[in-house]
C-alpha cells in the first residue's frame, strides 16, 4: 500500500506490511529467503514462481563466497515452481542429484527443458596468430573433425561463432573438387529453394558436410586449407623489417603481424569497428600498463601529462585535508551522500573552508590528448593505416568527463587510460570512477573496457569485439560461452570478432569435455540438508 505525492507524482508512505498486491520481487541471492517468506505470507506457494537468473555464477570454482548462501537458499526453499535460466545450464543428465532432491521435496514435479540457439549472427573467432578459426581448419585428423561436428550439432549455440565467409569458402572448395555426396549437394539439400538458404541453414549444412566428407580425402583437404589461410586483418608491409631502419610506426606494424593484432591503441586499432571492445583478463593492471606503453606517446608529452597529474594530485591532497577539517567543523554532518553548498553553511569558518575548497578545485587542470594518440581519430588513422577506415570505432571522452576523472583520488594510470578511451573494472575503492566507467560503457563512449572474467555475468552493455586473455586458459567451457555472449547483442549484423590470446581456449570450446565443473558444483550445493 502506498500513496502518490500530488506535487511530484512520486510514490511515498509505502506500507510494506500489506503485500497482497505485490506481484514481483527482484532480489539478490542473499535476500532470497526474506523475499520468499514475504511472498509466502500473502500467496499460495503453488502460485509462486522463483526465477533464478544465471544459476551458474560462481559454480566454476570449488569455493566461492556465494556457495554457502546458495546451498542455504536451496535447502530452505519452500516454492515448488522454479525456473533456472542460463545459456550454459548443464544438461539434464548431469544434474540428476539436484533434480532428484527437488522431486523428493515437492510432489508431482514436472521437469521441462527449453533450449534455443541463435546463429543468425556471425561472430568470427580469431586465434592468437590472427587467423579466423572454424572446425575445418582446426583438426588434422578426420576422427577429430567428425567428433567436433557431432558435438557442435548437439550444442548449436556454438554455430554463432562460425565465420560465414570461411564456411562458404570451404563449401565452395568441396564443390569444386567434387567432395560432396550427391544427396548433400546444395541443390538437393536445399531442394532448389533459395528461400531456404539462410545463415542458420548454411551453418547446419556445413556441420552435415563435415561428417560426410570421404575420410581418405581429409588429409589433402586439411593441407590445402592450412596452406591457403590468410589472416583476417592482414596488412602487407612494403619495407624490410630491420630495427635499425624502421620508424616506430613501421616497427609496430611489423609487431602487429607477428602478434596476431594485439596493438589495439596503434597499428590494430582500425580493426575494432562499429562499437566498443571488452578485454577479459585477470591481469587487468598489466594489460592497462601495456596499452599505455604501446600508445606511442612521446616522452616529452607523457612527462607533461605526468607533471599536470602531479600538480592535480597535490591540489587534491589539500582538498582532502580541508574537507576533513570542514567535516569536523560541521560536527561530521557532511557525508558522501549529502553534499552541502556554501549557502547552507552557517559557520563563518565553515564558509571560509568551503570557499577554499572551491578555489582549489577550480585550479585542477583538465587533461586531454592530441587526437593523433586517440585510437581511430582521423589524425591517428593517418599514421597507422594507408586508407581511412570509416567503420573504425572512436572513443568519445568529453572535457567534462575528463575533468570529473581528474578530480578523483585515483591512480594516475587509470586517468591516462581514460584519456585513451580505455576504462578498467579492477578491484579498487573509488566508486565514483567505477560509476563513470559504467556510465560511459552504457553510452558506448569507451574504446575498450578491461575487466575480469566475472564481469561477464549481469552486463547488457553492447560490445562488437572481445579479447580473451591468455591467462584465462583454465576458464571452463561454459564460462567461455558466457564470455562470448557479451558480443553481438544488438539486432543487426556488424563486424563482430572474439579474439583469443591462447589457442587452447578455442580447442576447449569446440571439444566435448570429460568433466563439467559447473554441474559438479551445482550437484554438491543444490541438495537439501538432511533435517530439511
Give the positions of each predicted feature.
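Structural recognition of the conserved hydrophobic beta-strand(s) that form the central parallel beta-sheet
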Residues: 24-28, 51, 80-87, 159-160, ...
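A short beta-strand element within the Helicase C-terminal
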Residues: 447-472, 496-499
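Conserved helicase ATPase core of P-loop NTP-dependent helicases/translocases
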Residues: 7-15, 407-411, 420-452
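SF2 helicase catalytic motif II
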Residues: 22, 27-33, 40-83
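Conserved interdomain linker/interface between the two RecA-like ATPase lobes of SF2 helicase motors
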Residues: 92-384
